[in-house]
A protein has these predicted regions:
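Ligand-binding clefts of soluble mixed alpha/beta catalytic domains
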Residues: 1-490
Length: 490
């Protein structure tokens, strides 16, 4: 609104009028800075935020809306920097029109996405929305269609990180799940079904714990501050776009851990694969994603010799490291994320195969596991495999086999690389399990694979980091000729 003394015929008056409008846009409800804006300033480097479309307002005149036109229209958009790296950002304001999205709101989101794609920078979306603004009609749904088109276009081009900072429901709940990393804050809910339809409180079926377990959420935060800190942390492992190299930092120290003593002498005894990972990567750099989902496989980022890498590893502490449909799907998406953003992949293998149950078959194991094999074969980044113990049957194939596309495969002397377990081999060959001990000696070791070039080296566990460092240096120059095609269908 113009002040009573503002003279719009003068330059000073016009500047005063602009200042008043911008001040109103920063507190559109007249009650101080909204949480949506505070989240942006907390996320970005101090003083780096440049807002776009701050004076945008809806154009609707139905239902008396012409008298209620707050600036920003309920979403703060713009660009800035995180640790000196340029990013685009948007933050939804759950206080304006109950967090609903209208036509202008959607235009702002598509514009900031277009800006991020055009300039090749990551985009961070902070979500708090209850869905479409019903008063504006079907144009709001068209806005959601445009938004989904943009997040789809951005996928694999620029890193996308989503934060659920407030309740996000209905069709608004879909776009954040397209992100490469999704952070959900405790106490919020993300769901497409209204609570009265689902028959339960939203947090029970759409809260942080539920999404962490399902794998929808990669990270869970206790509050806004931690959520935004996690965004800054994970961004440090990602390049600006699909044309940039994975980040490099100064090489770190190595944890003091004896890898030669990690594998138990008893085959049935488990150990923690995360100990192996932490002993090989730069100290303190392993950043696990999707920790609560499919705990039989570990995924996350790390640095090795200062190079950002993706980690995929069987976890013997859960299901003895056996793969299931959830683990395959979790690993497949992570492998594709690494490949999209030029991040080498290091895999640690200790798995007896797939979980052989009717429930898994009904859960779509074959279809979901095929996604993992496809992702492994399709990935053109450097791929290194370390077989620590079991690589039995399908697990050998799916977990970074040489002929599935791994560039370098290393086996520990404790590795058991075979078609099947010794008891099953005895049964298949001799019709009984009486020859299990002989089959164990004949098949369950790494040397047959090494003789046939299926393992490049059998190495001492304590030498693992050295081999990975040198392998990563070699694979910096890796080039793969791709067969032209539109896209795969798996």
């Amino acid at each position: 609104m113009w002040g009573p003394m503002t003279d719009l015929k003068t330059t000073a008056g016009k500047i005063e009028d602009l200042d008043a409008k911008l001040a109103e846009s920063r507190a559109p409800l007249g009650e101080g800075e909204p949480a949506a804006r505070t989240r942006v300033t907390q996320l970005l480097d101090e003083g780096s935020f440049v807002e776009t479309d701050a004076l945008a307002r809806h154009r609707s005149t139905d239902f008396g809306r012409e008298h209620d036109r707050p600036y920003t229209d309920g979403v703060v958009t713009g660009y800035g920097s995180i640790d000196g790296r340029r990013v685009c950002v948007f933050s939804q304001d759950g206080e304006i029109f109950d967090g609903t999205m209208g036509e202008v709101y959607a235009e702002k989101l598509t514009k900031v996405y277009d800006l991020a794609i055009k300039t090749g920078v990551p985009i961070i979306g902070i979500y708090e929305s209850t869905g479409p603004r019903v008063q504006e009609g079907i144009v709001t749904m068209a806005g959601y269609a445009r938004l989904m088109a943009r997040v789809s276009q951005a996928s694999g081009l620029i890193p996308q990180i989503s934060v659920i900072a407030g309740n996000t429901s209905g069709i608004a709940a879909f776009a954040p799940t397209f992100a490469d990393v999704l952070v959900v804050t405790q106490g919020t809910a993300l769901h497409q079904a209204a609570s009265h339809v689902a028959g339960a409180e939203p947090e029970t079926f759409g809260g942080a714990a539920a999404h962490a377990e399902s794998g929808t959420a990669h990270l869970v935060a206790s509050d806004d501050k931690q959520a935004l800190s996690l965004v800054r942390d994970v961004l440090a492992y990602l390049p600006a776009n699909n044309r940039a190299e994975a980040p490099r930092v100064e090489a770190g120290s190595v944890a003091d851990f004896d890898l030669n003593a990690v594998i138990p002498d008893t085959a049935a005894q488990a150990y923690d694969m995360s100990d192996v990972i932490k002993a090989v990567v730069d100290e303190g750099s392993f950043f696990e994603l999707s920790a609560e989902a499919a705990q039989n496989i570990l995924t996350g980022f790390a640095y090795i010799d200062g190079r950002a890498v993706g980690i995929v590893a069987n976890q013997p502490l859960a299901l003895a490291g056996a793969l299931d449909s959830a683990a395959a799907e979790k690993a497949a998406r992570f492998v594709r994320t690494c490949d999209a953003f030029n991040t080498p992949i290091v895999e640690f293998v200790d798995s007896p195969g797939f979980v052989p149950t009717p429930d898994e078959e009904r859960a779509g194991l074959l279809r979901r596991a095929s996604k993992f094999a496809y992702a492994q074969a399709e990935a053109s980044v450097g791929k290194l495999t370390v077989i620590t113990r079991k690589a039995i049957g399908p697990a050998y194939v799916f977990m970074g086999a040489k002929d599935l596309g791994a560039d370098l495969v290393y086996a520990w002397p404790t590795a058991e690389i075979a078609v099947t377990q010794a008891s099953q081999a005895s049964l298949a060959i001799y019709g009984s399990e009486d020859m299990e001990e002989e089959m164990d000696e004949l098949f369950l070791h790494p040397y047959a694979a090494a003789e046939r070039g299926l393992a490049d080296n059998v190495i001492e566990p304590t030498a693992t980091r050295h081999y990975l460092v040198e392998g990563l240096r070699l694979l910096e120059r890796k080039a793969v000729a791709q067969v032209p095609k539109k896209h795969g269908t798996v």
